[in-house]
Amino acid sequence: SVLLPLAKGCQDVSALNDWVQAAARENRELTAFGAVHPFMDGLEQELDRLEAWGVRGVKMMPLLQQVYPDDPQCFRLCQMLVDRDMILIAHAGRDPLDRPEVYGTPERFASLAASFPDLKLVLAHLGGLRMWDAVRRHLLPAGKNVFFDTAYVSFYIEREEMKELIAHMGPERVIFGSDYPWEMPGRAAEIIRDLGLSRAEEDAIFFKNAAELLGQPL
């Protein structure tokens, strides 16, 4: 399992990373990403610290952090991640609370991907929770380094639409996610299995794509 810590404020980052990395070191079945805020002081030092621990990527959440991903102030984070060959995973789209400002729209992430084609970018919720028409328009043509996870989408998308969207993305760009504790992993996995995908497509989504992205042996 991959832990994705979320720091809402700049001041929360370092302590949260200390805690989640300690938890991962105590359980070899866990892989922990780092928390990050693109506007924080000491960003480079925090990324250096995570890199020294062997952390493969970081999580940001534009909606809670109130950050537009294509804001030029985010570019230093993206360049630092490219320089370290680290992954950026981000919440994309709306949330269940229907906040008036989305921040992380598919269009803005497409703009970011165009600015940083070498950035390994994983967009949660199949690229944009409850914004899948915009995902089709703006993110399906995005570069080969843009991936999509399946976390928490099953409450908002019909199975046939989910299957069709995965087919258009290409199963090789889709990574299983649950967004636990908001969705139980077992339930999320059963929904993927019920889509009628091939065994090779399921294997890619459940573990092969993630293992390749993380540089882990299959």
Please place each PLM-identified region on the residue numbering.
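Mid-to-C-terminal alpha-helical segments outside catalytic/metal-binding sites
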Residues: 48, 168-175, 183-218
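Conserved, mostly hydrophobic/aromatic
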Residues: 20, 50, 58, 81, ...
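Catalytic domains of carbohydrate-active enzymes, especially glycoside hydrolases
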Residues: 1-4
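Short alpha-helical
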Residues: 11, 41, 129-130, 156-157, ...
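Catalytic pocket-lining loop regions of alpha/beta-barrel enzymes
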Residues: 56-57, 70-175
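Active-site gating/metal-coordination segments in enzymes
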Residues: 8-96, 100-103, 156
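Alpha-helical elements of Rossmann-like donor-binding domains used by nucleotide-donor carbohydrate transfer enzymes
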Residues: 19, 45, 49, 76, ...
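Conserved hydrophobic residues forming the short capping helix/wall of the S-adenosyl-L-methionine
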Residues: 24, 139, 196
